[in-house]
């Protein structure tokens, strides 16, 4: 990382970057949506591709001099199609939210009815939250999980679809630890005449490696981010096998975006090449093994998990029986060198600013090379701190353990 060049021009910015690197190096990152991009991915993002405007698509640009950015975008598209067995890939969305927006504008009209997962049950802001553009422009009806099991209530989903006749059903989540039944969702969509869109932002890396069923054979359109489990640059992508390519492309450009971020697209190409390797598949297998081990050890320590465990890379801790809120827990474990995020749990009695849960995931710590023995240690540290929030000596000793662990598994070593 070339901090010296930045330091010569802007020491304040360089210091912030250096401090962030230090934070990442010496804390345990358990936020499920975060990961560690490779040096190659970061180098591509910092390349001369950032200098080039390239409105349009490869072979059909509104600017000259695009022959080499065309190569980069075609590499990204072709590799994405190979990775996910898709006929169509659009790698231009700046984010997962904009990928979702592009799909909505391609398939819907303002005011159309859409069925999406409730944010408080594990959905996402762009799945119809009233504070999001999605909830303001479209008429979202929400389905959720069963209170007893914490798993998606497909009977409720089918009933709501039959009652409201949505034009689109949105599946996928930001805080759901179980495998999603895509064949059942497709069946419900076909029964009710709806399109099916799957937002696989959280599980894309698992899907690419065969560690989670793929939505591509079932959904009309699939969206994703390119970071999270996919371990690429921050960005979005749209995939489809159902012939919607022309509509989707026109709604990204010129519909909601102008010039694509060619340096990020080049980094996406690099990340997708990495994702096509056996090493990436082994990494994703370890992500899932680590999550299962971490979940089991937490439950052995008396920590309640929503749905009783995990099938993917994340778990949702229900802190109700520990007499601590999600907000308090987030701050508490951060003192011990562990980063998590507060998160609502299904049927939460606290609001989203406080919450009764925290979300935990294994992508970043697995990228550092940690395996099951480290998961047991991390679970013990996390559970001990959560159960003894007033024990400052315990917090300090845990922070020391965390620092030792991080030094044994450095990032960018």
Curated annotation (Swiss-Prot):
UniProt xrefs under PROSITE patterns: SHMT (PS00096)
This enzyme's EC code(s): 2.1.2.1
Cofactor(s) it depends on: pyridoxal 5'-phosphate
GO biological process, one term: glycine biosynthetic process from serine
Entry GO terms, CC: cytosol
Intracellular or extracellular location(s): Cytoplasm
Residues given in the record as (6S)-5,6,7,8-tetrahydrofolate binding sites: 119, 123-125
InterPro entries registered for this protein in UniProt: PyrdxlP-dep_Trfase (IPR015424), PyrdxlP-dep_Trfase_major (IPR015421), PyrdxlP-dep_Trfase_small (IPR015422), Ser_HO-MeTrfase (IPR001085), Ser_HO-MeTrfase-like (IPR049943), Ser_HO-MeTrfase_PLP_BS (IPR019798), SHMT-like_dom (IPR039429)
SUPFAM superfamilies, alphabetized: PLP-dependent transferases
Primary site of residence: cytoplasm
NCBIfam families referenced in this protein's UniProt entry, alphabetically: PRK00011.1
Description of how the protein assembles with itself and partners: Homodimer.
Protein name: Serine hydroxymethyltransferase
Source organism: Desulfatibacillum aliphaticivorans
């Amino acid at each position: 990382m070339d901090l010296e060049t930045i330091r010569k021009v802007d020491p304040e910015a360089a210091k912030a970057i250096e401090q962030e690197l230090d934070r990442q190096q010496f804390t345990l990152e358990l936020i499920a949506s975060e990961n560690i991009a490779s040096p190659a991915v970061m180098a591509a993002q910092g390349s001369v591709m950032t200098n080039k405007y390239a409105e349009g698509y490869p072979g059909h640009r509104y600017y000259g001099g695009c022959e080499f950015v065309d190569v980069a975008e075609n590499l990204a598209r072709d590799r994405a199609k190979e990775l996910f067995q898709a006929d169509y890939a659009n790698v231009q969305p700046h984010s997962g939210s904009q990928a979702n927006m592009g799909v909505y504008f391609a398939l819907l009209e303002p005011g159309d009815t859409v069925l999406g997962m409730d944010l408080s049950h594990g959905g996402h802001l762009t799945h119809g939250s009233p504070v999001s553009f999605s909830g303001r422009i479209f008429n979202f009806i929400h389905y959720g999980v069963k209170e007893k099991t914490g798993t998606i209530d497909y009977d409720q989903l089918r009933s709501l679809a039959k009652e409201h006749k949505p034009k689109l059903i949105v599946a996928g989540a930001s805080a759901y630890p179980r495998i999603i039944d895509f064949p059942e969702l497709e069946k419900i969509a076909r029964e009710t005449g709806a399109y099916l869109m799957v937002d696989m932002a959280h599980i894309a890396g698992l899907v690419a490696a065969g560690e989670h069923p793929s939505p591509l054979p079932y959904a009309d359109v699939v969206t994703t981010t390119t970071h999270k489990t996919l371990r690429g640059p921050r960005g979005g992508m749209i995939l489809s096998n159902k012939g919607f390519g022309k509509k989707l492309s026109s709604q990204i450009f010129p519909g909601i975006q102008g010039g694509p971020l060619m340096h990020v697209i080049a980094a996406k190409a690099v990340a997708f090449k990495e994702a096509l390797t056996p090493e990436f598949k082994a990494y994703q297998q370890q992500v899932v093994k680590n999550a299962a081990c971490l979940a089991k050890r937490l439950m052995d320590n008396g920590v309640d998990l929503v749905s009783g465990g995990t099938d993917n890379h994340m778990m949702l801790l229900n802190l109700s029986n520990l007499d601590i809120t999600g907000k308090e827990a987030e701050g508490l474990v951060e003192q011990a060198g562990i980063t998590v995020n507060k998160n609502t749990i299904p049927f939460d009695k606290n609001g989203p600013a406080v919450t009764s849960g925290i979300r935990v995931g294994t992508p970043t710590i697995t990228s550092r090379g940690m395996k099951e023995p480290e998961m047991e240690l991390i679970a013990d540290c996390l559970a001990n701190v959560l159960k003894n929030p007033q024990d400052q000596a315990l917090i300090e000793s845990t922070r020391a353990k965390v620092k030792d662990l991080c030094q044994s598994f450095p990032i960018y070593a």
